[in-house]
Amino acid sequence: MNSLVTQYAAPLFERYPQLHDYLPTLERPFFNISLWEHFDDVVTRVTNGRFVPSEFQFIAGELPLSTLPPVLYAITAYYVIIFGGRFLLSKSKPFKLNGLFQLHNLVLTSLSLTLLLLMVEQLVPIIVQHGLYFAICNIGAWTQPLVTLYYMNYIVKFIEFIDTFFLVLKHKKLTFLHTYHHGATALLCYTQLMGTTSISWVPISLNLGVHVVMYWYYFLAARGIRVWWKEWVTRFQIIQFVLDIGFIYFAVYQKAVHLYFPILPHCGDCVGSTTATFAGCAIISSYLVLFISFYINVYKRKGTKTSRVVKRAHGGVAAKVNEYVNVDLKNVPTPSPSPKPQHRRKR
């Protein structure tokens, strides 16, 4: 295969020698362009030197939302605003806000894609040179660029609270799954930053990848553009969730066995505080419980409105689990039973 590539690529490189400058390398996997250096330069210029990514250090107490009290205040304020707002606006007409909603989703698509590409650039050499176990369990994978990206992703979690504000203003239903997820994810990111867990890149990069697709879909939908891959938005969320569980349970096992049951087989310790390890495991596990609960409600409790609507939807749970975060079942007509097939009489 390599010889075939060389055979067909050689004439191209002879004709356009400048293409050699864009061959990917381990340190620069995106066309030999250092995304981090360009990002550092652009952000430094835009902020007039107030924020220099390459010089960033996460120091608790010196940065916004870097200690527990303001984090809890922000999350509490989020719940007060959305539930108080829903009560205060209950008798008003729904706001349309389609233009702002499009802008919101376009901004979050761009932010998620930027952070994802920057993170992949940092992770490729770590994983290739040192292996996957090193990347998720060794302190050497807790690098300055990645910590900078982790903190920026953490701040974005609070920006994503605006998702729910739109639901309130548009008089959409607020479900426990949606509201809990936003608050819990912000808290999860805080605990992992404080606990220096090297595995942080796994759930963060997967989540960023899903959010690129999800927010882009919401942007297109707000513009009235239908896409064939709608149901894959939630399938990607489910895949992300399963991978998160696998990686995090592996890391928690390594940590727990190393500390408390060293005679059991394990690879070694996983870096990160015990508090961060078990807090992360608890929050991720709660997502598992919520999804299983939804699944049981749809497929095991026959006859409920949720079950009938979801089962009749194209794609079933995979297409509707995320949509049911926002949909108001009271306003969804109960599907009528499918009519019995009529047979033509033979003459």
UniProtKB/Swiss-Prot annotation:
Q: Which UniProt keywords apply?
A: Endoplasmic reticulum, Fatty acid biosynthesis, Fatty acid metabolism, Glycoprotein, Lipid biosynthesis, Lipid metabolism, Membrane, Phosphoprotein, Transferase, Transmembrane, Transmembrane helix
**Where is this protein chiefly located?**
endoplasmic reticulum
Q: Record's InterPro entries?
A: ELO_CS, ELO_fam
Positions in the Cytoplasmic compartment? 84-96, 143-146, 222-231, 297-347
Please give, as recorded in its UniProt entry, the membrane topology of this protein.
Multi-pass membrane protein
- Catalysed conversion reaction: a very-long-chain acyl-CoA + malonyl-CoA + H(+) = a very-long-chain 3-oxoacyl-CoA + CO2 + CoA; octadecanoyl-CoA + malonyl-CoA + H(+) = 3-oxoeicosanoyl-CoA + CO2 + CoA; hexadecanoyl-CoA + malonyl-CoA + H(+) = 3-oxooctadecanoyl-CoA + CO2 + CoA; eicosanoyl-CoA + malonyl-CoA + H(+) = 3-oxodocosanoyl-CoA + CO2 + CoA
Q: Where is this site: Determines the chain length of the elongated VLCFA?
A: K255
GO CC, one annotated term: endoplasmic reticulum
So what does this one do? Answer: Component of a microsomal membrane-bound long-chain fatty acid elongation system, which produces the 20-26-carbon very long-chain fatty acids (VLCFA) from long-chain fatty acid precursors and is involved ceramide and inositol sphingolipid biosynthesis. Component of elongase II, which elongates 16-18 carbon fatty acyl-CoAs such as palmitoyl-CoA and stearoyl-CoA to 20-22-carbon fatty acids by incorporation of malonyl-CoA. Involved in the synthesis of 1,3-beta-glucan.
Protein's name in the database: Fatty acid elongase 2
User: Corresponding gene?
Assistant: ELO2
